């Protein structure tokens, strides 16, 4: 599993992305080139020593990075509420060998859904219509590992 962060800017969210991803054995995280990273103390503090335990690659152009990942055979799955979103529990992750989970920015979500193979949504039962991007990532990674298993390997 790889994670592509689309313009996530909050240092705490970047740090928690690494912390949660490492907990589930994620192989690689892609960050936009101007994202805060190991020079930012809030990122370092929230990541809790996981920043260099996961491969990280910085990209410049979001659409170009999506196209490259698709050319490499990855299925791009956006974690986003759209009219076409599939309930996360109904999405079969086992049908996809190479997966990139796409996280949208805190304010605007995923800016371009044209290259996405699917969008998944997490059912919510309260009055709030959204949740923090990293909470969504944690729930999604739990569902992925629940479906595909891990057998103590990177996913």
Language-model features and meaning:
Residues 1-82, 145:
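RNA substrate-binding interface of SAM-dependent RNA methyltransferases
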Residues 81-124:
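Active-site/ligand-binding-proximal alpha/beta "capping" segment
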Residues 16, 61, 79, 105, ...:
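Gly/Ser/Thr-rich helix-start
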Residues 56, 76-86, 124-131, 153-154:
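Short secondary-structure transition/capping segments
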Residues 14-15, 40-41, 87-89, 111-114, ...:
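Short glycine-/acidic-enriched loop or helix-start segments at secondary-structure transitions
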Residues 17-19, 43-46, 90-94, 115-117, ...:
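Short, glycine/charged-enriched secondary-structure capping and boundary segments
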Residues 113-155:
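Structured adenosyl-cofactor binding patch, chiefly the S-adenosyl-L-methionine
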């Amino acid at each position: 599993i790889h994670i592509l962060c689309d313009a996530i800017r909050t240092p705490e969210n970047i740090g928690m992305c690494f912390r949660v991803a490492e907990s589930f054995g994620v192989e690689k995280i892609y960050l936009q080139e101007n994202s805060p990273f190991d020079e930012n103390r809030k990122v370092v503090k929230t990541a809790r020593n996981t920043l260099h335990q996961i491969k990280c690659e910085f990209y410049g152009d979001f659409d170009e990075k999506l196209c490259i990942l698709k050319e490499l055979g990855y299925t791009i799955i956006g974690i986003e509420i759209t009219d076409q979103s599939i309930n996360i529990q109904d999405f079969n992750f086992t049908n996809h060998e190479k997966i990139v989970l796409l996280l949208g920015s805190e304010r605007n979500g995923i800016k371009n859904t044209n290259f996405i193979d699917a969008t998944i949504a997490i059912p919510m039962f309260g009055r709030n219509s959204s949740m923090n991007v990293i909470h969504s990532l944690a729930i999604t990674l739990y569902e992925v590992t629940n479906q595909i298993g891990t057998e103590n390997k990177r996913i």
